[in-house]
Amino acid sequence: MTRLVLYLICIVFASSCVTKSINKVNFSLPPQNSKELISRVNSNNQPSQWLALKGTVSLFLKSDSEVSLGISIRVKKDSIIWASVTAPFGIEVFRAALTKDSIYYINRTNRTYFIKPISNISKILNTDIAFNDIQQILAANPKIVKNKYSFKRTNDNFMLTASDYIYTVSNSFRIISGVQIEKGISLIYTYSNFIFENNFPEQLEFLVKSPSQNEFNLTINYSKVVFGQEQKTSFKIPKSYVEAE
């Protein structure tokens, strides 16, 4: 019995020592280097288990034409990204779902569908991007990629710069913009108007620039943001639909 008591005391003592050794992030003091800034950003931007977004999406083509439609996005952390795009009067144009393994897509206008490996996203956008990247960008909490960064403070923001990554961070430690450069292709995302709950942005602009391909420029303006509520992510392919090539 005495040995058991001593054992429990040792566990409690060891646990308290571990707890004391954890350095809490001090948000009251401005960061002095890249390591301190990254620590604040990652601690300040924790993803919700569920996220529901509603708004309008605009796709800008290189020919300067613009297509604007309604959009609803539902994200279950590390599981699924579901999206429905609608024309005026709420008529669904297409529905898509991304998992860590696959892309599911239904086109209502021509009654077609496809199911492809998630790696096809990189081919569609002509840049290296994975499920986790898309999830973090949509949830407005992208992680700063491990690298050696130069640190700079401007009037209201901070900048982290490396050879292939650039981040602009607000004084509330939210990422305002990120740039990833690989093989001459730039993937750029920008957030603006942090007006919603949890300091969530009103607008996301996503741009892929390539010297040899057409630009992919997409802007989403959110009108409604819901955190932490379980959402339906139904995806049923009608039997009459034909598989697209």
Describe the residue ranges of each PLM region.
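Sec-dependent bacterial lipoprotein signal peptides
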Residues: 1-17
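N-terminal leader/targeting segments and the immediate start of mature chains
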Residues: 17-67, 242-245
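Gly/Pro-enriched, hydrophobic low-complexity segments
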Residues: 147-245
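An acidic-aromatic
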Residues: 80-131
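C-terminal low-complexity, charged extensions that often adopt amphipathic alpha-helices
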Residues: 124-127, 132-152
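One face of beta-strands
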Residues: 49-57, 67-73, 79-85, 94-96, ...
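Solvent-exposed loop/turn segments connecting transmembrane beta-strands
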Residues: 62-66, 86-93, 163, 183-184, ...
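Beta-strand elements of well-folded, non-transmembrane domains
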Residues: 59-61, 75-77, 87-89, 208-212, ...
